[in-house]
């Protein structure tokens, strides 16, 4: 996993998988699947730090484990996840809310938006999507990779002056970054990660707590200048992978790209 800084808020991950046929006659093993994550991130006025948190992966698939459907081999790769994806947190606890704390997150593959299969769009807390799988030798689309993405943003605040009232503990936020937020349906692993990321905000303390309070509040708290001692974090993970490749002429290698762009306002 590699992170490179540039002038715009851009972070990308490329999943590159090589599939090799065994030399044995009638062999069904596609061996040596390698997943590589590469990240690129920048921020004009950085208040957040961003990272793609999964190391490179190596997968192997066996056609004996696939089912055939409409001329395709369908591989259930749900045992390969969840994998942490985009994560972020404030460099330091903000004295007050205001501009520069609200990230807008968009996902794409090869310049095109994810094909959303479940959920209204890619801003919701949980959605299922697919991206094209290409043969790197020809550049042609040879299949698709489907997955579920869960995401959440959380805040915790410390002591407040009169005029501002915020819950104690870690609250999920709903708004421009993540919509359709329901605390009870966010995976516990992501909640635990959000708590850990909040603690990475430099200066976390002064009455703050990273313990989940089960509440959902408006993301407007990040832009509210009345709110003091503000910590924030974002986390996402991909899981429930399904790979579809042609049953005839299965490519020796395939590649799929997952890109995420972060614009902070």
Curated annotation (Swiss-Prot):
GO biological process: cell adhesion
Entry-linked Pfam families: Fimbrial_K88 (PF02432)
Residues forming coiled coils: none
UniProt keyword terms in alphabetical order: Fimbrium, Plasmid, Signal
Subcellular location: Fimbrium
Domain of life, per lineage: Bacteria
Signal peptide bounds: 1-24
GO CC term, one of those recorded: pilus
Presence of keyword Signal: yes
Protein's UniProt keywords contain Transcription: no
Protein family: Belongs to the fimbrial K88 protein family.
Functional description taken from the UniProt entry: K88 minor fimbrial subunit, plays an essential role in the biogenesis of the K88 fimbriae. Fimbriae (also called pili), are polar filaments radiating from the surface of the bacterium to a length of 0.5-1.5 micrometers and numbering 100-300 per cell. They enable bacteria to colonize the epithelium of specific host organs.
Protein name as it appears in the record: K88 minor fimbrial subunit FaeH
Protein species of origin: Escherichia coli
Gene name as annotated: faeH
